Amino acid sequence: MNYNNLLQVCSDIHLERDDISDISKIIIPNAEILVLAGDIGNPMTSIYNNFLDYYSKLFKIIFIITGNHEYYGNTIIETDKKIEEICDLYENIHFLNNKVFKYEGILFIGTTLWSLIPEDYTVYNQLSSMNDFKLIKKFTLDEYRKLFINNIKFIKDNLEVNSIIITHHAPSMICIAEEYKGDKVNCCFASELDKIFMDDNVIGWIYGHTHNNLSLITQKKFMYSNCYRTDNYNKSGTII
């Protein structure tokens, strides 16, 4: 599988932390398409806008996926609307919020995904203290689960030959770092979607969120993450 430096991935930059002095040093352009797989920053801030404006000039296409952190401080609807407004300013930036984009015979399927939280009240009690439910306005556990169900349906309904799925949350428990294996809150980071990944139509799955980078690449498929705030983040890394 080789498309000659078609895709470059970055996620979990967290521009909202205000500790990045030079946005030009975050990514070294090395591909046609930049995939921003969530938790890039707060879209209500100038640094988020400046970041997209800068890299829009360096890539042919940019795909944006929202992570959970983009929504902190606002509602889901308010945040999505703001990102749409920003992306509308650029011909080459596309917000794949339950949307698809076809390029060079590849169908890119984008969604935040969220994750499968089991109907277990013990787990519910643990999860209710997480920031997603404190900092995203009008956001509940039930809403979280509904979003996941809807996003999975969106992925399945749109699969076709040569599909690459782009999500923020991880598609498999193999994406979880070894030291966190078995933790009950892993259900907020990854879901067991290996069956979808192994579908003959799927050639790749890009994700973020776990802050644990994975590069699983075979002749027919890849599963890949490149989170910014990690020791092995690759500024110029490409997948295919």
Language model: regions and residue ranges:
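A basic- and aromatic-enriched beta-loop-alpha substructure that forms the phosphate/nucleotide-
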Residues: 61-135
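Active-site-proximal beta-strand elements of phosphoester/diester hydrolases
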Residues: 4-14, 105-114, 164-168, 222-228
